[in-house]
């Protein structure tokens, strides 16, 4: 609907030419795939362990209640490719940190993080800024 279109158009301002757009499972896929289609560029899925069909890089990350694993195809990103990383929620920053590491291992570099919602009290933005000061973070809604 109109809200989805407005979000996608807002996120489009962060896309550079020849950029790949990576989305983190599952709701990050919704915005990242739509934006990649709109901008006529590649979509890179970053998924939970065991869901991608061939050779992958894996990365453990912490959750409030334990740990999990994200994966990316080893050939998902053109060599030295720039990546716009999209997720639905920025909370502690753990998932996005793991995704950045995966993009780096796949030969790319994240130049921007975009989230639909940021939960400010969980300080994910501060953690990411301390670890990756060169990567700006944009959140559409901050609560």
Give a label for each model feature.
Residues 1-86, 90-143:
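PRPP-associated nucleotide enzymes
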């Amino acid at each position: 609907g109109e809200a989805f279109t407005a979000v996608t158009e807002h996120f489009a301002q962060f896309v550079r030419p020849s950029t790949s757009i990576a989305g983190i499972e599952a709701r990050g896929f919704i915005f990242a795939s739509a934006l990649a289609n709109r901008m006529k560029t590649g979509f890179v899925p970053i998924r939970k362990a065991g869901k991608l069909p061939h050779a992958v890089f894996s990365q453990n990350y912490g959750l409030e209640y334990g740990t999990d694993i994200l994966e990316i195809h080893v050939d998902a990103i053109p060599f030295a490719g720039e990546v716009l990383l999209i997720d639905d929620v920025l909370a502690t920053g753990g998932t996005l940190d793991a995704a950045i590491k995966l993009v780096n291992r796949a030969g790319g570099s994240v130049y921007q993080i975009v989230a639909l919602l940021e939960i400010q009290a969980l300080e994910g933005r501060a953690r990411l800024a301390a670890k990756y000061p060169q990567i700006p973070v944009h959140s559409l809604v901050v609560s």
